[in-house]
Amino acid sequence: MKKVLAIAVMALCAGSLSAQQNVNFQTACHPRDVMHYDTKTLRERFVMEKVMSPDEINLTYSQYDRFIFGGAMPVNKDLELENFPALGLSVDKTIAEPYFLYNRELGIINCGLGTGPVLVDGKEHVLAPKEALY
């Protein structure tokens, strides 16, 4: 099964400037264990607290189907989706590939109020609010 990455974006621009990149990990929980979790434990196991923050890319790697989800919010600079070595070193060596989309698909949704340019393989796509690019 192909891995899918969905990034909710205010206006993601692929550029050469380095962005703060944060990666969190969610381990799988057994359904019988989850039945006994209190609210605090449920939030610790399943909520991604930090999705959108200025000039950062925030991702969470979930062991449920090796799904990666997150957000990017360029405010003062372009953001570039780079490979995250932490993904290959800490969780799953099969995803330590030469570049982030080597063996993955990407879905981008513009959650902002304005248009957002996205640069893919040298071609610019301008997304209107609520538009998606796959």
Predicted regions and their residues:
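Glycine- and acidic-residue-biased ligand/ion/polar-headgroup-sensing regions
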Residues: 64-87, 91-122
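A generic structural signal for short, solvent-exposed coil/turn residues
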Residues: 8-11, 51, 59-61, 101, ...
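Bacterial Sec-dependent N-terminal signal peptides
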Residues: 1-21
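Generic recognition of cysteine residues
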Residues: 13, 29, 111-113
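A generic local secondary-structure boundary/capping motif
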Residues: 57-58, 97-98, 131
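Short acidic-glycine-tyrosine-enriched beta hairpin
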Residues: 120-134
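Short beta-strand-initiation
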Residues: 54-55, 64, 102-104, 128-130
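A short, N-terminal "cap"/entry segment at the start of jelly-roll beta-barrel domains
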Residues: 20-76
